[in-house]
Amino acid sequence: MTKLKKVMISLVAATLLLLAGCGSSAVVKTDAGNVTQDELYEAMKTTYGNEVVQQLTFKKILEDKYTVTEKEVNAEYKKYEEQYGDSFESTLSSNNLTKTSFKENLEYNLLVQKATEANMNVSESKLKTYYKTWEPNITVRHILVDDEATAKEIQTKLKNGEKFADLAKEYSTDTATSTNGGLLDPFGPGEMDETFEKAAYALKNKDDVSGIVKSTYGYHLIQLVKKTEKGTYAKEKANVKAAYIKSQLTSENMTAALKKELKAANIDIKDSDLKDAFADYTSTSSSSSTSTSN
């Protein structure tokens, strides 16, 4: 779960806010001496200060210009919940996270996405060019196993008439989908492992099954559930635009958008220990114009 680290930072941010300026009150008492709130604040600032002040500052700047609704956050949360299945809560817990703190981070990420989208130049010519290689979303089931021998064993059972979904429940090591018969959410080009995606799009008819596909995750068998024919540009324009925008939500473009937002906010860092917190966002480089040129 790639966003968990930022959630952990946001929890530290909340602690820093509570501790800032609290003074000499003890948070831990020992016979050897006390650990004061000031000492804890300074130690946490040294370790996490730059990352925390970045997130707190950007959140305040972005909230002033963009709105993320509870419905949007819940929709994003549900995607992760479905992706991780029964292991979702334990994954949060093992990373010292709660549902609330994870949703707070999702809200922040959505704010950054909206700022990035606002910084894009989505022209008609760019969409038409993108349409040429764009394909509609595809829906498949898959069975993931660790070794080729097991994949061949499953192939034999499929040839003998056993159902793909039943075999996914029995064999697949992808715990997020195995209980649902291996069913994956619809996906488009560029969203999955390249080898997996190529094999999935090569399937022509409903219920067709691929050969054994080796990816970075292991060995797959893929069954086609739904594949929509590509329509005309006029018919598909809304889908093409959504896919294009999604493809442009890269770290490079997000950084470029945040640089622009930071410059417009006229920030003034008062704590000398944090003077370099925004160095990556105030330096002048070619990347600062990346998102407007895509």
Swiss-Prot record:
What are the record keywords, sorted? Cell membrane, Isomerase, Lipoprotein, Membrane, Palmitate, Rotamase, Signal
According to UniProt, the reaction catalysed is: [protein]-peptidylproline (omega=180) = [protein]-peptidylproline (omega=0)
Q: Signal peptide span per the entry?
A: 1-21
Q: What is its main location?
A: membrane
Topology of this chain in the membrane: Lipid-anchor
Query: The organism sits in which domain of life?
Result: Bacteria
Q: What is this protein called?
A: Foldase protein PrsA 1
What is the species of this protein? Listeria innocua serovar 6a (strain ATCC BAA-680 / CLIP 11262)
State the gene name recorded for this protein: prsA1
